[in-house]
């Protein structure tokens, strides 16, 4: 959604014609996860989301953000959860952090970088445990419960398999994780 002038002069958002895997809300913007991209609307447009730039000549802090996950693996993004450092998003084999080093998140300052390469069960959303995030990995014979801590804009987070002591406790076909 956007004005006729903006739509005509703007590139189409990357989600057009593609499946949207998840809809989130992050920093006063509607966030869409589609393919390997995280697409954020213009801020404050939740009622009528606007994914088109204001001007093709300049970049504004209020422009939408459309950023792709750079990876050596196929990395379709299926889910995300807000943490202090930014928006942590999950593909089936990698996790990425959408963040900024600046105080304002805008198209010029947004970064989407890989923070870990742990398998993730795309059918069950990650959950917040306060200062950590837990999520399931069902890539083996049984599911594994992982906990991610100390996720920051720099460096790698600590990822611990907290179900390691009971490796056969969680069946592969779990369909719910809650805190």
Name each model-derived stretch.
Residues 2-7:
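Short, small-residue-biased leader/transition segments that mark boundaries at the very start
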Residues 33-62, 99-104:
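Beta-propeller domains
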Residues 37, 69-179:
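Beta-sheet-dominated scaffold domains
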């Amino acid at each position: 959604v956007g004005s006729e002038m903006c739509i005509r002069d703007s590139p189409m958002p990357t989600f057009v014609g593609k499946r949207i895997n998840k809809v989130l809300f992050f920093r006063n913007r509607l966030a869409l996860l589609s393919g390997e991209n995280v697409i954020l609307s213009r801020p404050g447009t939740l009622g009528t989301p606007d994914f088109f730039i204001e001007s093709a000549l300049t970049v504004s802090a209020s422009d939408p953000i459309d950023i792709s996950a750079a990876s050596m693996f196929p990395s379709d993004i299926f889910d995300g959860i807000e943490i202090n450092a930014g928006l942590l998003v999950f593909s089936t084999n990698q996790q990425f952090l959408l963040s900024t080093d600046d105080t304002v998140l805008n198209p010029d300052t947004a970064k989407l970088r890989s923070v870990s390469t742990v398998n993730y069960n795309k059918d069950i959303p990650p959950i917040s445990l306060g200062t950590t995030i837990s999520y399931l990995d069902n890539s083996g014979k049984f599911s594994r419960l992982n906990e991610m801590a100390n996720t920051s804009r720099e460096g790698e987070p600590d990822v611990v398999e907290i179900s390691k002591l009971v490796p056969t406790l969680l069946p592969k076909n779990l369909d719910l994780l809650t805190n």
